[in-house]
Amino acid sequence: MTNMRKSHPLIKIINHSFIDLPAPSNISAWWNFGSLLGVCLALQIITGLFLAMHYTADTTTAFSSVTHICRDVNYGWLIRYAHANGASMFFIFLYFHIGRGIYYGSYTFMETWNIGVLLLFAVMATAFMGYVLPWGQMSFWGATVITNLLSAIPYIGPTLVEWIWGGFSVDKATLTRFFAFHFILPFIITAMVMIHLLFLHETGSNXPSGLNSDXDKIPFHPYYTIKDILGILFMALALLMLTLFSPDLLGDPDNYTPANPLNTPPHIKPEWYFLFAYAVLRSIPNKLGGVLALALSILILMLFPSLHLSKQRSMSFRPLSQCLLWILVANLIILTWIGGQPVEPPFITIGQLASISYFCIILILMPTMSLMENKLLKW
């Protein structure tokens, strides 16, 4: 009799995806982030669902409903902070996952990579809308500033902004629709993740060497399931430490003040995971130029397959490109720091230089370095 996991129509799909899946024998801990992102997504959906049971999407009661969750609901504080800090963990893992893809040349799987970039956009949109829901000062003003950027679009901009707002300012209609979108998007993201995996399993995983590993494959279970569980335990430890010891470490104190349209906070800034893009936006004095640079700072990921000029796939054996990539990482950390600083000297200049370097490293230096390495290796 055939094993049920190999014959049952539904279980067969799970078997081919997570149990009998042939995986390269040499994938390192950098390949753990995919499963960690999946766990993060599940955690966010579960905690979000419980929060939605007590939250009210109305400008008069939104702030107090969040307070009520933290004070009166059984373990409401834990659910709320696990959700907020879970989002931070999500982005940490996302950035590691993308960095791994760039380092090891995983972007040569075009379909998987492009779906991944679309996933990044969807997660960013979800996180932005979620930040608006507590209806604190930074929620309100963040929503006002970011949605206002669309008014830079020629001709249709101002109408588009009012259409998104559902009125002439960020108000009740905006909050209600943001809650609706924040609720539905994670399920759309889940569907996109399935497509992401579908395309990945068409080609099989990349390996640190960047070479074809068809000659040496091992079953995903038990080798990589146990490895993923270890990663999940580390993640659970980090998230619990953050949630139980310093839940507000990554938040903004301004968001503990109820939204007030008549009082602007001194420094409007998004959550830490958007600061690098926010710094790029602010570094350009022109509004439309800033919006385009903001979009391009993430859309540039789509260009990686076209900019790959090296004869080798991975950076494992390319020390010069490795140095450049780590310079890019340092540059992104500088951009993140600048995004959280006020718009005054010397931060303006540092932000402009870091933004120029960001685009130069990716568009000019990395392809040039690849060609140079080809020459050095006489290829």
Swiss-Prot record:
Transmembrane segments: 33-53, 77-98, 113-133, 178-198, 226-246, 288-308, 320-340, 347-367
Keywords from the named record: Electron transport, Heme, Iron, Membrane, Metal-binding, Mitochondrion, Mitochondrion inner membrane, Respiratory chain, Transmembrane, Transmembrane helix, Transport, Ubiquinone
UniProt subcellular location: Mitochondrion inner membrane
CDD domains cross-referenced by the UniProt entry: cytochrome_b_C, Cytochrome_b_N
Positions of heme b b566 binding: H97, H196
SUPFAM superfamilies: a domain/subunit of cytochrome bc1 complex (Ubiquinol-cytochrome c reductase), Transmembrane di-heme cytochromes
Binding-site list for a ubiquinone: H201
GO terms of molecular function: metal ion binding; ubiquinol-cytochrome-c reductase activity
Free-text comment on the cofactor: Binds 2 heme b groups non-covalently.
Extent of the signal sequence: none
Major localization listed first in the record, in broad terms: mitochondrion
Membrane topology: Multi-pass membrane protein
A GO CC term assigned to this protein in UniProt: mitochondrial inner membrane
Listed cofactors: heme b
GO biological process: mitochondrial electron transport, ubiquinol to cytochrome c
InterPro entries reported for this sequence: Cyt_b/b6_C (IPR005798), Cyt_b/b6_C_sf (IPR036150), Cyt_b/b6_N (IPR005797), Cytb/b6-like_sf (IPR027387), Cytochrome_b (IPR030689), Cytochrome_b_C_euk/bac (IPR048260), Cytochrome_b_N_euk/bac (IPR048259), Di-haem_cyt_TM (IPR016174)
Binding residues annotated for heme b b562, in chain numbering: H83, H182
Function: Component of the ubiquinol-cytochrome c reductase complex (complex III or cytochrome b-c1 complex) that is part of the mitochondrial respiratory chain. The b-c1 complex mediates electron transfer from ubiquinol to cytochrome c. Contributes to the generation of a proton gradient across the mitochondrial membrane that is then used for ATP synthesis.
Subunit structure: The cytochrome bc1 complex contains 11 subunits: 3 respiratory subunits (MT-CYB, CYC1 and UQCRFS1), 2 core proteins (UQCRC1 and UQCRC2) and 6 low-molecular weight proteins (UQCRH/QCR6, UQCRB/QCR7, UQCRQ/QCR8, UQCR10/QCR9, UQCR11/QCR10 and a cleavage product of UQCRFS1). This cytochrome bc1 complex then forms a dimer.
Similarity section: Belongs to the cytochrome b family.
Misc. remarks from the entry: Heme 1 (or BL or b562) is low-potential and absorbs at about 562 nm, and heme 2 (or BH or b566) is high-potential and absorbs at about 566 nm.
Protein name: Cytochrome b
Organism this protein belongs to: Dactylomys dactylinus (Amazon bamboo rat)
Lineage: Eukaryota, Metazoa, Chordata, Craniata, Vertebrata
Gene: MT-CYB
